[in-house]
Every structure is written in C-alpha cells, then in structure tokens.
C-alpha cells in the first residue's frame, strides 16, 4: 500500500514537471520568434499610426499615434 502511494506521488510529480517544462519551452519559442520578426518590422514615424501596439513606434511611446 505504501509503495503504491509513493509511486502515485512520483508519477504526479514527474507529470507536473513535464507540463511546466513544456509550457516554458513553448513560451520561449514564441518570444524568440517574435523577436526575430520584430527586427524586420517597420517602425512608424513620429505622429504615425500605431494603434495600441507600442512596438510599432520602436523607440517612442504609442497611444494611437507615435509620440
């Protein structure tokens, strides 16, 4: 009975570790892909349209227009 309980706990811990690692790896992969596309991204001029995406303004603030 004790051996079964220990095995069940071990399986649960290993499963949790696998899920955590998988989620982190996917997150890192998406961040790296986004950075590679950002280096090729067009930067709006000051006063140009950016919507609510501050990354379009590159080095300035953004709220509908680049500041």
Curated annotation (Swiss-Prot):
It is found in: Secreted. It comes from the Eukaryota. The modification Cysteine amide is found at residue 66. Its main location: secreted. InterPro entries: Conotoxin. Residues 1-22 form the signal peptide. Keywords: Amidation, Disulfide bond, Knottin, Neurotoxin, Secreted, Signal, Toxin. Disulfide bonds join 43-58, 50-62, 57-66. This is Conotoxin Cl6.8. It comes from Californiconus californicus. The lineage of its organism: Eukaryota, Metazoa, Spiralia, Lophotrochozoa, Mollusca.
């Amino acid at each position: 009975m004790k051996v079964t309980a220990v095995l069940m706990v071990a399986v649960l811990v290993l499963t949790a570790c696998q899920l955590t690692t998988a989620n982190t790896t996917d997150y890192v992969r998406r961040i790296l892909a986004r950075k590679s596309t950002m280096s090729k991204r067009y930067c709006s001029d000051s006063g140009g349209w950016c919507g609510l995406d501050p990354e379009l303004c590159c080095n300035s603030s953004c709220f509908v227009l680049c500041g």
